[in-house]
Structure formats: C-alpha cells, structure tokens
From Swiss-Prot:
Keyword Cell membrane found: no
Subunit-structure text: Heterodimer consisting of MSH2-MSH3 (MutS beta). Forms a ternary complex with MutL alpha (MLH1-PMS1).
Organism per entry: Candida glabrata (strain ATCC 2001 / BCRC 20586 / JCM 3761 / NBRC 0622 / NRRL Y-65 / CBS 138)
This protein's name: DNA mismatch repair protein MSH3
Superkingdom in the source lineage: Eukaryota
Acidic residues composition bias: residue spans: 41-50
Gene3D superfamilies linked to this entry: 1.10.1420.10, DNA repair protein MutS, domain I (3.40.1170.10), P-loop containing nucleotide triphosphate hydrolases (3.40.50.300)
Gene of this entry: MSH3
Amino acid sequence: MKQASISRFFKKVSAVNKEKVDQVKEVEKEAEVDEVLDLTLDSENDEEQQQETPVLEPIDGEEHPTVSKVPDLNDSRLLQKQKILNASKDITNSVDVSAFNEKLKDIMNKRKLGRIKGSLIDESDEIAEQSEADEHNIKKKRKKSDQLTPLDRQVKDLKLGNMDKVLVIRVGYKYKIFAQDAIIASTILHLQLIPGKVTIDDSNPNDSKYKQFAYCSFPDVRLKVHLERLVRSGLKVAVVEQSETATTKKFDNSKAKTSVFERKITGTYSKATYATNCEFEVNHENILGTNNSIWALDIEVSDSIYKYYLWSIQLSNGEVIYDSFEESKDNFSKVETRMKYLNPSEIVSPVVDSFPIKLKKRFLDLQLCQKNYDILAEDLNIPKKELLNNRLIELWHILYRYLKEYSNEKLLNIGSNYRHFSQKISIQLQAQTINNLDLISNDDSKGTLFWILDHTRTPFGKRLLKEWLLRPLLSKDAIVDRLNAIDCILESANSIFFESLNQMMKGIPDLLRTINRVSFGKTSQREVYFLLKQLTGVIKHFEAHKDYIEVEINSNSGAIKTKSTKLASIMTQMFEFSLSSVIPQLLLMINVSAVMEKDQKKQLLGFFHLNNYDNSENIIKMQRDIDSVKAQLHDELQNIKKILKRPHLAYKDEVDFLIEVRNTQVKGIPSDWVKVNNTKMISRFLTPRTKELVELLEYQNDLLYNEISKEYDQFLNRIASYYNEVKTFIMNLAEYDCLLSLAAVSCNVGYTRPVFTDSNEQLIIAKQARNPIIESLGVDYVPNDIEMEKDSGRVLVITGPNMGGKSSYIRQIALMVIMAQIGSYVPAESLKLSVFDNVLTRIGSQDNILQGQSTFKVELSETVEIINSCTSKTLLLLDEVGRGTSTRDGNAIAWALIKYFVEEEQCPFILFTTHFTIVTTVKSPLLKSYHMNYVQHKNENENWTTVVFLYQLKAGVTDSSYGLNVAKLAGIDTHIINRAHDVAISYKNDTEFDTNMILFQKVRNILANRTTARETLKVLLELDV
C-alpha cells in the first residue's frame, strides 16, 4: 500500500505543468495514509515509536524550508513531499523532463528490488542530489571527488582524519555509517547495506560506478544498543553529532553559509573507555569496560631477556599503575600475572609490530594499537617524574596522547592516582596461584573464594575487596588492625550510627566511576544529581551523629578508638570531610524535577535551580528574552482572532504556534498565510508574523540551550575541583564496606579468628580446618588438623588413593593462609600461624599448544620459576609433580626435587602430594609423610580392591593409588577393569627388580660422586623431556 502511494506521488511529479494543481490536491488526500505508513520505516524502531519524535532538521544539501519548524512527524511527511514538488519545478525548468522521468523510474525500480530503504526525507535528498549531479554532468565532466554530495564530502573529510575509528554520524533522525565502516557495521548490527562507494579514497575498482558512499543506518533512539555492540566486537567507535541547528545556521552570521550542518566528534569509545565515556543512563553494575584497563607497553628485546616497561590506567577507579621488569624470553609468567591483576582490554605500544610471536599469542583477545607520538611541551608535566626511568617517561607521553583521543587524559595529571605495581606492603600472588586456588573468576560465578567473601554493598567496595584478596598483607600489625576492626564492627552493629550507615550503603551506586566521569565531563545530569545526593546523604548522616562520633570515635577513651584505631581513623576522616564539604550546597543548585525528566534535553534545560544557582544571571536574561517573544506571539494571536472573527481561538500548541482552520472556512484566509499541513477536517497555518516570531523563538531557545550547556560544563568542573577529597571519602567508604563484608564472613558457623605469632619462626597449626570453597557448595566436608613448624613437618608429603582428598587438603591450607592475611576469619576451630611472604602453587596438568609446550614442559617450567622465587617464609603447594612424563622419569624428578628442598637453607613450607612413594624415602627431620585414610574391601566378580574414602589425614605412606577404583566410579566395564588389574600386577613384578632404570642410575652416580642436591636437580631438569 505504501509503495503504491509513493509510486503515484512520483508519477505525478513528472507530469506536465497543467497537471500540477491536481497533483498537490492528490498529495494532500494521501497525507493521512502516509502518516501511518511512514511510522514503519525501520523495523528496529518498533519499541521507540511511542516516544516523542524530535523536530526534523533540513536535509543536508538543500535550501532551508520556508517554515522554520515542523510541528510533528505526521505533518512533516507532507511538507517533505511539498518540498520535493517544489524542487521538481526547478528541475523541469533546467533539465529535460524525459531525462528526469528516467531518473525517477530508476529510483523506483531500485526501491522495488529492496535496494533502497529509507524515509521520504532520504529519498528527496537523493533526488535533489542526483539531479544536481546530472545538471553538472550536462555542463561538464566532473572529477570523481567532486561528484560527491556535500554530506559525503564532509564524511570523507571526517574519515580521513580518523581512519582507525568507525564513524557513526548523525543525519537527521538517524545515525549513518558510511563506506568501509558500513561494510563492517552492517555485518555486526545486521543492518541493510545501501550500495555505493565502499572506500573513502576510491581505491576499490567498483567505486567508480557510484556517486555516493555505501551506507547503513539506524534510528537515533537505538544508538546505545548499537554502539555497545560495535564496541563489544573490538572496534574503536567515534560518534559524530550535528553541532548546529537550522535556526542557528540561519541567524548566526559569524559562520560561512554552507549546504550541510557542521558536525564534529562528540565521543570516542572502546572496550576500556565505554563505561567512562558513555553518556547514557546505566541501570546495571557490570557495564562494558568497568573493570578493564588500557596498557601502554614497551619492550627491550635481547638474546635471552625481555625487559618490559608498563603503564596501566583503569578509568573507572582512576588507578594509574607503572612498572618495569625482566623475564627470560621463554617465560611470560610476570606478564600473565599483571594481566590477571590489571585486566587490560587494549594495548598501545610503539613496537607492536616487533612483539615476539609468543607474546602476541598471549594478547590474542586484546586490541593492539601501534602508536608513536612526538613529545609536545604540554605533556611534560608528569606526576612522580623523579621515580621514573627514561623509557617509562617516553611511554607516558604515548599513553597521554592516546588517551587524548578519547578525552580521558586528565587522570594522568592526578599524582595521587599513581602507584607502582609491586607494593612492599602486600603479597603479589602469581597468576597460576590465582587460577589454581580458584580465588576469583571473570564472571564472579560460584565456586571461588571471592564469592564466599563478597558481602559488599557498593560496587566500589566490591572492587576493593577483590584487590585485598589478590594482595594479602605482609605486615602483622596491618592484619591485626583489620581483624580488630571486624570485631569492633560486630560489637557495635546495634548502634544507631552504624546500623543506619549500613542500611544507607545498600542503595549507593558506583560513586567512584561517576566522580571519574565528572572529571572527564562525560556525565549525564541525572548521574550528577545522584552522585551529589548519595554523598550528601552520607555527609548528613555523619552530621546528625556528631555527638556519638565525638564521644565514641574521636575521643581517646572512646569505645571505637580503644578497640580499633583503623575503624576510628576511617570514620574520623569521613566525619572531617562532612564538616567542610560543599557537596550539599552544590546539590541545592539542582532542580530535582528536571533531572527526572525522560527527555535529556529537558533535563539539561531545567537542570539548575535558578534561585539557588550562583551564576544564573545570563540564563535568567535569556529566559526573559524567550518570554518576550512568546508575549509577542500572544499579541499576534489577538490580531488573528479579529481577522478570523473567532474570539476564543487559541494556538494548536505553544511549540509550533499553528492556527487551525476548518477546511470549509479556508477561503476566507489571507493569501499571505502559509499552509503548513492539513487533514480531512482542518488545515494549519502560520501567519507571516507568527512565522517570523517562531523562527526567532527557536533561535532564542538554541542560545539558551548553548548557554546552559556551558554552565553545566562549568558546574562539572567545580565538582571535579574537589576530586581528591571526594575520592578519598569514597575510598574510606569502600574500605568500611570491605570490613563490613569480612565481618559478615566471620558470622559463618565454625569460623574463627586467626592468631598470628609474635616470634619470627614460621608455623601453621590448625584444628579441624576445612576447605571454604568446597564447604560452601553444600558438601559435608570432613575437617582435618594441620601442623607444620620450622624444624618439624616443614615439608609434608601426602600420598593416598585417587580422589581421596589430597589436593583439596593442600588447597585448604593455602586458602586459609590467604584469608588470614587479608584479615578474615577462617573455617577452623583454631588457627595459629606466622605471616608468609608468598603462596606459590604447581597444581594440575595441562599443555600449552599455542606456545609449543608439552604438559611436562609446562610443569617443569613452572617448577623452575618456583625454585627461583621461594624463600623460607613461602608456602609452596606441589601437586603430583612428575606425572606429566613416564613413571620412571616422574619418580626421579619428584625425589630429586624434595631432596633439593630439604637440603636448602631457605627451605619453604611445602605441601607435596604424590603417587611416587619413593619421595618418602628422603631422609630429613623436616619431612613428614601422611596419607588420606580409607578402608578397602573386595566385591564379588572383581579382582581388584574397592576402597571407601574417609578423607582423613593419617600419618604414614600408602603404596597404592587405587586407580582401578576410580575406573569403576567412572563406569568402565568390570571385564576391562579385571584385565587392567592383571596387567598392573604383571607390570609391578617386572619393574620391582629392574636395575636398568636410566634416571635412577644417574641419581645413584650423582650421589656416589657426592654432588649437592642443587646439582642433582639441575642435571635432571636439563634432560630432554
């Protein structure tokens, strides 16, 4: 129906002049049908059609319409058709009618084939532009670049300056993506691609067939959805907006008149910057990019060593990390550890093309960007410059210039955000330890230690708790301070001050992310309001409990201060900020009703409470100018009433100021009145005077909008001037949130406060300890004791059947140490321990095909790294080392490794699980042997022994792994297991007297030569495996 309507319209446009009057009448009759049909122009706009439709701007490349403002979507369609009709009159005067007819037929054929999709606005643009091109082609042949429409020429200029970005450009109601960007976007967004030039520079041979760029488009209300999809696909996306309106273009004489609107980039987005730079309302916590960082990385490559220089910036929390470190060319554990901590999503580097292949394989999921900028004078003010080497300073400039592309460079100027990656006050857990112990997961799913500990109430508190977990404390005093604070919170939980504060924190959004967005000037009005409101709420809470704070917290004899200096310090700092903060005054300057409006333009226009805002003079003056124009429009209405002799006449609305007249009374209308639109019953008009005043009113409204936009930016700058104070306040609140979360953990049944020894001697002694992760999953976990001391049980060798609980046991010890050193209660009857300087693990069996490493190569590489990293205060978990190779080789490696450690002066605390019982033959007072207990029995028709796991640690060694029992549990047929049992017995008899085991013979030779354990291990590790 719609196609037929449009087809009839265009046929009438191409008719001879004597039919023009009839054509206009026919168009008017069809208007009502088209009003409905045009609402279905884009299937993606189904949900948004109910929203208020914005005013259409004039088409790029056309003259401005005679009416300054189109009242609504329905009326606009007819007006656009009338403009096409007027354009056709000019065309028929200068171009042969038959040629123009052919052009129209071609367009209609394309539409029938589904190759053109768009509104009458797009189509009128196309007719005008193509006919203009035809006219010029008649006069002379133009160059390819000159054949572009004014809009396409503007697109080309924008794209040439931003070749690394996908440009999403506003054109009227829609956003369009052109040329090569359109090819990519149409595939990702599943949008129809309109044929045209697919390259900006006409490098594609087929581009010569087209006069316009290929493009795809979507309604402006879908920008948020499509922008996030593009960014999730790993693209860097720039949004281009119109920076002027039709009215401003007409009245502003300071700029040269052009046929297109001025456009500029208003926002650039990537995975790491989306959360900070997006200007949409965010209704969920896990917005894209919240936890991602941007890296600037440089590498010095030598024959055997890579030296890394690193900057990392996390835009959501403002953290700036710097580091430099070395690794051997075949080892990337330090890089992987930093990736685990800092979670980069994009890396900028001057040497990306020179990255070693093995390193690039680790960055497969990241965006790599090669950049090398010249150092400019404006970049020279580097915070903490005295702590940086020359390579880091050069790399800082690259990061600064890169962030400037996103308008996020301001954070690099705040010295309080800087810190070195390796902090002496905490342990830097390695990536393999984090993975092997299931400390965290990328999606915060169940089955991790963080999932157990996380009872935080705020997003920024949650991030800080995760940082605490990955960085256990090294200072006993700092650990005890946290434990004391937890106890104090539990004892004070019933006080009105703490109870109210705890309830208030439940609804607080991500204030840390918001204050960083404010510093970038990227925040919506509603977001600013809620930032100030939430901060003011906490401030008012402290002010309301001033007496309690003075007596219980600030006083030296106060209950809080005597029990926990840490908790008292947090509360005191927050209280002092509350007394001096201007945040409540800034909140009063905001008009609450305006920021709750759905329309963003209304939010901005009404943002300031003018009675309270201290710089409202210009705004008030402009509002008076607008009121003056409206008064003149009402005066004009009185004249119109007299002309029409309708004393009760009123404007249709006070937006477009149209006069509605019944069609039966149209004959009495003055000839100079302009008909804007009509229906079957009425017609709407503008008088010459109202037309003039409406245009003036729009211009005044544009000036007001620009003025308030400037004032809003100044308001954000005013808030940002208190960035350090506000961030400190938020971080204090985050720290209290973490302590409150750990206090909730301490309430779990069977959890106890760990006790740290005053002596320097290392030990772990626990009664009835449990694995917190397995227990939390609903398993009835069997508790076990732990006893490891400096001179006895420093090395525990644990044997036992498969699935007997060996790995779970050693993991629970490491988990309890980490929990204790972040200041948490632990799952045990009691725990006494000393502070460990690291927790290292070698658990699991896996290969690394991408890096060309076998399972055993990975195992030995990690083992060598552990040997080089551990000290006498390190807790070391070794789970079945040697299982990645043959039994003989594995026996030898495991034995030599334990022999090496027990002879070392800096022997760490070791938990060693194995099926190689030869390890227990190592003689040393430091070593104790245990196994996981079980009972065994035989079933009928089964040659092998079936075991029942008791999961209890028992002194001594077990000589069988009972792997056939696991085969039964896995459902393997009994006949196969019986056969396997016979083979196992035969194999055992053959190997017991085998004196030709190569590696054992080498060990005997080494011992006979009285070599050291280190030399023994070195020989074994250098074997070709």
